[in-house]
Amino acid sequence: TILAKNCSCTYKGVKINIVDTPGHADFGGEVERVLKMVNGVLLLVDAAEGCMPQTRFVLQKALQQNLSLVVAINKIDRPDARIKEVIDEVLYLLMDLGATDEQLDCPMLFCCGRDGTASLDPDVPGTDLVPLFDTLLSTIKPPEGDPEAPFQMLVSSVDYNDFVGRIGIGRIQNGVAKVGEE
């Protein structure tokens, strides 16, 4: 990922916005811009490869902003998965980056993205993504803002679509966007 990508889904009546950020320090400006748009971080770590150098950079920025953290150890189905070692790698990295006790006590899930499953226990295979979404809802605080205040939005990127026209992508700070507003 060079530029952040975003999507959203609705789970239990809550809209969850997901932003995939570049992981490399060379794209630090993009990472910092994106982290201003989110309330928490889902750190995805490969069960075989473990923490990558770019993991350190993005995680450090997220911890500095005191964002809520959920760790997902992915690809646990790989024959070369090192789940317990990767858990230790993540914890050592968090400690090395000066994580608070609350950040160190973050929930960890064990996932197989290919199969669309997540589990809270590495020894119990997941059957769906319900544990992941439930954990996101219980761990990451909803955005703060006043829906009655005038509309304010922190625009992080601008795009263009032939059908819709100019599109501003960002985080609503206050107010509500209404259809037909300019």
Regions found by a protein language model. Name each.
Residues 1-182:
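Structural and coupling elements of P-loop NTPases
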